[in-house]
């Protein structure tokens, strides 16, 4: 009897310790997701009913398809530029250049600063009367006028790169630091020059780190909200489109917004599934000390 009570009391204690986390999970994640799914199939403005019209309306609308394409353009473009920036920067910082600790700290700054504050700062920097255009018009002779960066697709990609490239940079630096230097030395002894060691040894071995950072950057950029909301102008990706459907009409189009949210989630899950399948099939190799 004592052992029975002791065994079940431990289970009860474990359950009560997990109960707050379970309540938070069901209340803050599971229930809202379930409600979103239900609303996405409910006719707009009705309490009951079932329809695919919310999905069909958005996907059949050229503006809806453009929003999806724009979201992919911003996410893919910012991911590519983040990789192009992160790999050389990681290689430089790996060499322990003077002040490398400070530079590593600066890499993490975009992760610390809230996206809204960062976007406002970038709007001021790239603005018509911002420091960037002030420098161009004052010191670059062939520039006759300010360049328009804000409220453009190119400007949004620049904003995304500044905010999200630390994901790629941190994972790439981590892969480089875990790389066994003996492998590079063996390549050099075999007659390979520095470029060949980098091209045929280092880059293939750090590919998993680059891919991991890339998927983090892509997912963050794909779901970005605050930055395109204030810096996107007429360019509205999926997250902003969802907000527009809820906030601008009175009453809000909750069913349409829920359908767009489900489409957005399905695209993210689909991309993540393709990425995981690519990794399982040997999309990258790694080496560690």
Can you describe what each PLM-predicted range is?
Residues 1-9:
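Short, Lys/Arg-rich, polar N-terminal cytosolic tail immediately upstream
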Residues 4, 50-59:
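A short amphipathic helical element positioned immediately N-terminal to and/or at the very start
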Residues 10-44, 62-146, 151-152, 156-176, ...:
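Membrane-water interface segments at the C-terminal ends of transmembrane alpha-helices
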Residues 43-47, 225-252:
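Glycine-rich helix-loop "coupling/hinge" segments at transmembrane-helix boundaries
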Residues 48-51, 128-129, 175-185, 194-196, ...:
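Transmembrane helix boundary and interhelical loop/hinge segments in multi-pass membrane proteins
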Residues 190-191, 204:
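Glycine/proline-centered hinge or cleavage motifs at structural transition points of membrane proteins
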Residues 278-289:
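Short cytosolic juxtamembrane segments of multi-pass membrane proteins
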